[in-house]
Amino acid sequence: MESTLGAGIAMAEALQNQLPWLENVWLWVTFLGDPKSLFLFYFPAAYYASRRVGIAVLWISLITEWLNLVFKWFLFGDRPFWWVHESGYYSQAPAQVHQFPSSCETGPGSPSGHCMITGAALWPIMTAVSSQMATRAHSRWVRVIPSLAYCTFLLAVGLSRVFLLAHFPHQVLAGLITGAVLGWLMTPQVPMERELSFYGLTSLALLLGASLIYWTLFTLGLDLSWSINLASKWCERPEWVHLDSRPFASLSRDSGAALGLGIALHSPCYAQVRRAHLGYGQKLVCLVLAMGLLGPLNWLGYPPQISLFYIFNFLKYTLWPCLVLALVPWLVHMFSAQEAPPIRSS
């Protein structure tokens, strides 16, 4: 295993030193492959293009992120940015590698969350675009473009994670395979407009299930804060260690989004726009308005106390689906209805 990890460091060193002009590209790719970007960009864009696909993206994101958290607790994967110090690799073969603000994530490293969660959540988008192109394009090469774009993007995300010293190549590969399999399995099974209690119980099950696993492992003598301690110890700058990279931050996000999805689907605003037909221009306005609201909400400051941070994160992502599914379309629909000229009866 040591040789495999050493080869991963060598690969990161090659990416950083042989292709330094690609640094900004890798930073952008890892940002676009971040699970938080699924909530901020891909979910709203997919929803306003297709209601079914948008809900699938959100649902698969929150379930897969929860599974990724549990997998990481059991697999205990090191991250390159601390392993090079803890293992003594530097003293044996000094590597010319350096960290970035995105390197210092505090959870275990295996499997890669960027690859697993994003790969699963983008699967319904890829399959929807593929089916559309299959009905309109006669060329076989044109029909495979969505699949090629999906694979190319995820490969780039994986390389960016190696470049940043956030993951080893085998962790990236595990995330890519697991994400694709989960996306394939879950896309046909996404619940659409179930009763509110279903989403409330899902949110509760995510919280209680992860907490039960955590305390069971803790009772058995496993210290699940080991990765937080190592990240804090070996990160070059303390300000690069962010609260929102902690394992329970993703749990609060997922449980909040599950509850928010149920609230949105059963809100009066959603009931009014559910049967309404929004034109392409209205959908574009919805997307712009949603991004204008979600952006500031995403970049709000966090409470310094860890418990308050988790509560704040839960409430923020509960509000997220309510804005995208209900409030924004309702506002656009209401203003469009007011501006429409009255129909004169003959």
Swiss-Prot record:
<feature type="topological domain" description="Cytoplasmic">
    <location>
        <begin position="187"/>
        <end position="197"/>
    </location>
</feature>
<feature type="topological domain" description="Lumenal">
    <location>
        <begin position="163"/>
        <end position="167"/>
    </location>
</feature>
<feature type="topological domain" description="Cytoplasmic">
    <location>
        <begin position="274"/>
        <end position="283"/>
    </location>
</feature>
<feature type="transmembrane region" description="Helical">
    <location>
        <begin position="141"/>
        <end position="162"/>
    </location>
</feature>
<feature type="topological domain" description="Lumenal">
    <location>
        <begin position="219"/>
        <end position="254"/>
    </location>
</feature>
<dbReference type="GO" id="GO:0016020">
    <property type="term" value="C:membrane"/>
</dbReference>
<dbReference type="GO" id="GO:0051156">
    <property type="term" value="P:glucose 6-phosphate metabolic process"/>
</dbReference>
<feature type="topological domain" description="Cytoplasmic">
    <location>
        <begin position="130"/>
        <end position="140"/>
    </location>
</feature>
<feature type="transmembrane region" description="Helical">
    <location>
        <begin position="55"/>
        <end position="75"/>
    </location>
</feature>
<keyword id="KW-0256">Endoplasmic reticulum</keyword>
<keyword id="KW-1133">Transmembrane helix</keyword>
<feature type="transmembrane region" description="Helical">
    <location>
        <begin position="168"/>
        <end position="186"/>
    </location>
</feature>
<feature type="topological domain" description="Lumenal">
    <location>
        <begin position="76"/>
        <end position="108"/>
    </location>
</feature>
<comment type="similarity">
    <text>Belongs to the glucose-6-phosphatase family.</text>
</comment>
<feature type="transmembrane region" description="Helical">
    <location>
        <begin position="308"/>
        <end position="328"/>
    </location>
</feature>
<protein>
    <recommendedName>
        <fullName>Glucose-6-phosphatase 3</fullName>
        <ecNumber>3.1.3.9</ecNumber>
    </recommendedName>
</protein>
<feature type="active site" description="Proton donor">
    <location>
        <position position="114"/>
    </location>
</feature>
<feature type="topological domain" description="Lumenal">
    <location>
        <begin position="305"/>
        <end position="307"/>
    </location>
</feature>
<dbReference type="GO" id="GO:0006094">
    <property type="term" value="P:gluconeogenesis"/>
</dbReference>
<dbReference type="InterPro" id="IPR000326">
    <property type="entry name" value="P_Acid_Pase_2/haloperoxidase"/>
</dbReference>
<feature type="transmembrane region" description="Helical">
    <location>
        <begin position="284"/>
        <end position="304"/>
    </location>
</feature>
<feature type="binding site">
    <location>
        <position position="161"/>
    </location>
    <ligand>
        <name>substrate</name>
    </ligand>
</feature>
<dbReference type="InterPro" id="IPR016275">
    <property type="entry name" value="Glucose-6-phosphatase"/>
</dbReference>
<keyword id="KW-0312">Gluconeogenesis</keyword>
<feature type="topological domain" description="Cytoplasmic">
    <location>
        <begin position="329"/>
        <end position="346"/>
    </location>
</feature>
<feature type="transmembrane region" description="Helical">
    <location>
        <begin position="255"/>
        <end position="273"/>
    </location>
</feature>
<dbReference type="GO" id="GO:0015760">
    <property type="term" value="P:glucose-6-phosphate transport"/>
</dbReference>
<feature type="topological domain" description="Cytoplasmic">
    <location>
        <begin position="46"/>
        <end position="54"/>
    </location>
</feature>
<dbReference type="GO" id="GO:0004346">
    <property type="term" value="F:glucose-6-phosphatase activity"/>
</dbReference>
<dbReference type="GO" id="GO:0005789">
    <property type="term" value="C:endoplasmic reticulum membrane"/>
</dbReference>
<dbReference type="InterPro" id="IPR036938">
    <property type="entry name" value="P_Acid_Pase_2/haloperoxi_sf"/>
</dbReference>
<dbReference type="Pfam" id="PF01569">
    <property type="entry name" value="PAP2"/>
</dbReference>
<comment type="function">
    <text>Hydrolyzes glucose-6-phosphate to glucose in the endoplasmic reticulum. May form with the glucose-6-phosphate transporter (SLC37A4/G6PT) a ubiquitously expressed complex responsible for glucose production through glycogenolysis and gluconeogenesis. Probably required for normal neutrophil function.</text>
</comment>
<comment type="pathway">
    <text>Carbohydrate biosynthesis; gluconeogenesis.</text>
</comment>
<keyword id="KW-0472">Membrane</keyword>
<feature type="transmembrane region" description="Helical">
    <location>
        <begin position="198"/>
        <end position="218"/>
    </location>
</feature>
<feature type="active site" description="Nucleophile">
    <location>
        <position position="167"/>
    </location>
</feature>
<feature type="topological domain" description="Lumenal">
    <location>
        <begin position="1"/>
        <end position="24"/>
    </location>
</feature>
<feature type="transmembrane region" description="Helical">
    <location>
        <begin position="109"/>
        <end position="129"/>
    </location>
</feature>
<feature type="binding site">
    <location>
        <position position="79"/>
    </location>
    <ligand>
        <name>substrate</name>
    </ligand>
</feature>
<feature type="transmembrane region" description="Helical">
    <location>
        <begin position="25"/>
        <end position="45"/>
    </location>
</feature>
<keyword id="KW-0812">Transmembrane</keyword>
